[in-house]
Amino acid sequence: MGFRIYEIKARQIIDSRGNPTVEADVILEDGSLGRAAVPSGASTGINEAVELRDGDKSVYMGKGVLKAVENIINIISPELEGMSALNQVEIDRKMLALDGTPNKSKLGANAILAVSMATARAAAEYLGLKVYQYLGAYKANILPTPMCNIINGGAHSDNCVDFQEFMIMPIGAKTFNDAIRMSAEVFHTLKGILSKRGYATSVGDEGGFAPNLKSNEEACEVIMEAIKNAGYTPGTDIAIALDPATSELYDPETKKYVLRWSTKEELTSEEMVEYWAKWVEKYPIISIEDGMAEEDWDGWKKLTDKIGDKVQLVGDDLFVTNTSFLKKGIEMKVANAILIKVNQIGTLTETFEAVEMAKKAGYTAIVSHRSGETEDTTIADLVVALGTGQIKTGSLSRTDRIAKYNQLLRIEEELGSIAEYHGRDVFYSIKKQ
């Protein structure tokens, strides 16, 4: 009976931005250990599960997580001890019942998620399986097409670019290994282009460059140049993906989108939709995340009707990995994809439920990191287990991002001849161009 939980430990550690986060150890009766650390976001949806912070301004500027750690040790651990680590659903539902709030504000989503992920890791260790094998069983053989963040703007940097993330997707690669090589080559080529133009090549939270470009358009133009100079064809070998994070630009009082980092221009929902439609015609853009604000459901509907058959439209702040919001989106025919962030919802069980709902509705799903990350690689295993075929985990720099890519390279090697990389074919929610 060594598969039962013997003890749960927790501690406060540091994330990639130097802020505290929660790490948990789940120890089974046979000594099997599962360890997991949770991430945190910079731009967060208003409906996300609550990340419990201590609020003591004299310690870590109020961002300590000792209360969440105490909740694991004093509340969660005593209740889970003796339970089977092999029943992930039962473990997760027990924690949800202990919390008893709709947004996990009592125990903290950071406390609950750390234990949820660590439990899965402990169970995999007990069974002698890799985490992706344990969570995904025989279906776990699809490597994801990566969204590699190469230019940062908005809340992720200190420059004049309004939109948060400009990414590349190696849709023409044959393997994940090739996809990473192609992305790295474009990343290094872009660095040379920026340097020649006199721009800084320092990087933002997610490892992308944060140059003080003259306009939002210039970001796309230098990326196009980098793709070509690296020897690839834009739109065929490598496509562009965007996360403008427009909730950060939206003024709910005036219902306008304010391009506050660049021109100061104010756009209505209709004008924002036309803005994206023009960009999609001008650049090889295959995916736009949070193209409209989370509160602007009417704007989202207009955007989906306008370009939803051509481009993957990803709801992040809109859906916050929550089946209630996703159900609303499906019923309204809003967006055609969901971003999956485990810490937005707080348990692995709820994460699987969200992906299942998305797939049944014909929506694509992208497993994602957060801007505040750790060396934890759970999402790399998770994306293979879920078979979503897409991952968003930053640039080709910073160890907190590279850790996920390296884990996926290992997984592809382990899978050998049964490993699949679908490239452009992962975009089943849009018409093939």
Curated annotation (Swiss-Prot):
Cofactor(s) listed in the protein's UniProt record: Mg(2+)
Positions that bind (2R)-2-phosphoglycerate: Q164, K341, R370, S371, K392
Documented EC number(s): 4.2.1.11
Cofactor info, note text: Binds a second Mg(2+) ion via substrate during catalysis.
UniProt subcellular location: Cytoplasm; Secreted; Cell surface
Binding residue positions for Mg(2+): D243, E289, D316
Enzyme class: lyase
Residues the record marks as active site: E206 (proton donor), K341 (proton acceptor)
Gene Ontology terms for molecular function: magnesium ion binding; phosphopyruvate hydratase activity
Catalyzed reaction equations: (2R)-2-phosphoglycerate = phosphoenolpyruvate + H2O
Predominant location: cytoplasm
GO cellular component assignments: cell surface; extracellular region; phosphopyruvate hydratase complex
Functional pathway: Carbohydrate degradation; glycolysis; pyruvate from D-glyceraldehyde 3-phosphate: step 4/5
Keywords: Cytoplasm, Glycolysis, Lyase, Magnesium, Metal-binding, Secreted
Database matches in PANTHER family: ENOLASE (PTHR11902:SF1)
Name assigned to this protein: Enolase
Organism per entry: Borrelia hermsii (strain HS1 / DAH)
